Structures are given as C-alpha cells and as structure tokens.
Amino acid sequence: MTGKRFGRVLKTLRTAKAMGLRELAKKAKVPPGYLAELEAGKKRNPSLDVLKRLAKALGVPVTELLE
C-alpha cells in the first residue's frame, strides 16, 4: 500500500466517524502533525504500535486501515 492510499483510507475512516484530526490524534496518542502527514501521504510506514492505536481509536480492526 502506498502512503497516499493509506492516508486516504485513514482520513475516510476518521471523517466517517465525525472525528477531527486533533481528536483522533489525542485518542491514538500521536502528535497531530504526524497524523496530518500520514493522511497527506507525506509519512509512510507507521509502526505497528501506531497502527494499533489508530485502529483502536477509530473502533476498527487494523486490517481495515490497510485495505
């Protein structure tokens, strides 16, 4: 999966949950700037720990982030 595709999936899931970027960042315990870069496709390959925290904060399985 490319960074841009992952970023689109992440942003789509976040907006579907009516969650702001800062809210998700706080729930997942990641810096808002890092989350913004992930969504923009500027950062790639988040760690498994970050993926798990994002998935938990969004209420989805990790695999859904990677589809």
Name each model-derived stretch.
Residues 1-16:
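A short, Lys/Arg-rich alpha-helix, primarily the initiator
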Residues 11, 22, 52:
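Residues within the helices of the helix-turn-helix
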Residues 14, 25, 55:
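The alpha-helix within a helix-turn-helix
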Residues 18-38:
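Short alpha-helical DNA-recognition segment
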Residues 29, 49-64:
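DNA major-groove recognition helix of helix-turn-helix/homeodomain DNA-binding modules
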Residues 43-44:
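Gly/Pro-rich interdomain helix-loop hinge
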